[in-house]
């Protein structure tokens, strides 16, 4: 292990990670969803974002179910709904923050 941890960081991440209004959950497991969404919402609030998109995919809806469970409990969420067909349809959820 190197003494300088910056050497272990890929070049594209050395400038920081850009936070956007979209979270893509492809490749994640349902048990990871609560922490990911809570962090995503906190970052969005810090940036003053009011509308977010969470992409969970169309598959078996396991991720979508977990996403909706977390959003229902969040004190920061005003409402959420399926994205328009142009934005992913039922494979993505739009979130409006308070």
Sequence positions of predicted segments:
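Long, charged, low-complexity intrinsically disordered regions
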Residues: 1-98
